[in-house]
């Protein structure tokens, strides 16, 4: 066993290593190891899920969540929605969500702006996310224009290029109000017209499959910088400008809920996307339309239920608000990148999605 002195000395060496000066070529060295996105079609998670079903704790919760998602896919009258918060797209799950949309496992997406713009659209432009090789002083990262998400790096200069691309798209569109869904549809169209440096992004796939993507807090992302710059420039020129209509987002997603009838939610994280999707039931009621609570719901989160926040609130709690049925619901308290690939692969290989009719909800809005 190490003495107290030895432990302190070890800690000093670790701190010195973290604060060591970084050579001028360190940025290139730091941005070497690319995050590779998991491919749910390349492995069969069914045996793992089947084994977990016989276990306890989070393993059994995960298996039950997989079962509920498969039930939703097997229910031919059910529309399944992906609710996405957090940074799992940057962490290696980006192609999971793309493949779920491509194979008709997801009919609508509600996500944070960062998931869609800073991560998915960012990579569609040919940029990458990188694995951090070891501890580096964050001030040194800042000096080298490297942004950090836990153990993942992003080139800030490339992120600013993403911001500028949003500005260019804004400047080409008619200056009026757009829901985030309509603007993201335009982003998908722009990529599909030959501008994508990486094929098969979630945005482009959703555009091609008629799957709407909603970002209720759209400007809380790289898109926000491009939109603000667009508006400032147009105001200075005394010209009309484009804006994002958040009310239209809520109205349109509620229209999808009303048209869909039975719905199932696959929730990764929580926050604004979670509450936004759940609230469509209440909004329909306020509009005088009787809408069923979301019939199937699973949520993967590490949030602590005791803080009273939306992200951590259980699905049973949502039932008290009239949002989610408690018959088929499961909370999985786990870090999402460890669980999402298992549940999604299990669903892919059980193939309950085969034969599902793709509703292409963008058609509700003339797209």
From Swiss-Prot:
GO molecular function, one term: deoxyhypusine synthase activity
Matching InterPro entries: Deoxyhypusine_synthase (IPR002773), Deoxyhypusine_synthase-like (IPR023496), Deoxyhypusine_synthase_sf (IPR036982), DHS-like_NAD/FAD-binding_dom (IPR029035)
Pfam annotation, one family: DS
Keyword Manganese: no
E.C. designation(s): 2.5.-.-
Disordered, as annotated region: 1-23
GO terms under cellular component: cytoplasm
Leader peptide range in chain numbering: none
Key words, A-Z: Transferase
Superkingdom of origin organism: Bacteria
Family according to the record: Belongs to the deoxyhypusine synthase family.
UniProt name for this protein: Deoxyhypusine synthase-like protein
Species of origin: Caulobacter vibrioides (strain ATCC 19089 / CIP 103742 / CB 15) (Caulobacter crescentus)
């Amino acid at each position: 066993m190490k003495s107290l002195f030895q432990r302190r000395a070890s800690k000093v060496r670790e701190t010195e290593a973290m604060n060591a000066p970084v050579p001028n070529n360190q940025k290139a060295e730091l941005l070497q190891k690319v995050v590779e996105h998991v491919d749910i079609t390349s492995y069969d998670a069914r045996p793992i899920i089947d084994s977990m079903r016989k276990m306890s704790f989070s393993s059994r919760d995960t298996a039950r969540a997989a079962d509920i998602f498969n039930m939703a896919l097997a229910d031919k009258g059910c529309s399944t929605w992906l609710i996405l918060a957090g940074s799992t797209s940057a962490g290696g799950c980006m192609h999971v969500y793309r493949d779920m949309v491509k194979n008709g496992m997801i009919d609508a997406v509600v996500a944070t702006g960062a998931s869609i713009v800073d991560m998915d659209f960012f990579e569609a432009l040919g940029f990458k996310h990188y694995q951090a090789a070891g501890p580096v002083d964050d001030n040194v990262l800042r000096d080298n224009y490297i942004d950090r998400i836990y153990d993942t790096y992003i080139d800030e200069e490339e992120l600013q290029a993403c911001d500028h691309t949003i500005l260019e798209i804004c400047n080409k569109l008619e200056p009026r109000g757009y829901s985030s869904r309509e603007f993201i549809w335009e982003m998908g169209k722009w990529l599909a017209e030959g501008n994508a440096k990486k094929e098969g992004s979630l945005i482009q796939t959703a555009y091609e499959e008629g799957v709407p993507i909603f970002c209720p807090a759209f400007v809380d992302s790289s898109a926000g910088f491009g939109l603000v710059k667009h508006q400032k420039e147009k105001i200075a020129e005394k010209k009309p400008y484009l804006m994002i209509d958040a009310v239209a987002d809520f109205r349109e997603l509620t229209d999808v809920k009303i048209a869909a009838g039975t719905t199932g939610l696959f929730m990764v994280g929580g926050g604004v996307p979670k509450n936004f999707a759940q609230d469509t039931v209440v909004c329909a009621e306020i509009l005088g339309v009787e809408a069923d609570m979301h019939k199937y719901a699973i949520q993967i989160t590490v949030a602590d239920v005791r803080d009273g926040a939306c992200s951590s609130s259980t699905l049973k709690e949502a039932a008290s608000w009239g949002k989610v049925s408690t018959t088929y619901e499961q909370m999985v308290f786990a870090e999402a990148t460890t669980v999402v690939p298992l549940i999604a692969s299990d669903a892919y290989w059980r193939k309950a999605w085969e034969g599902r009719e793709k509703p292409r909800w963008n058609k509700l809005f003339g797209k």
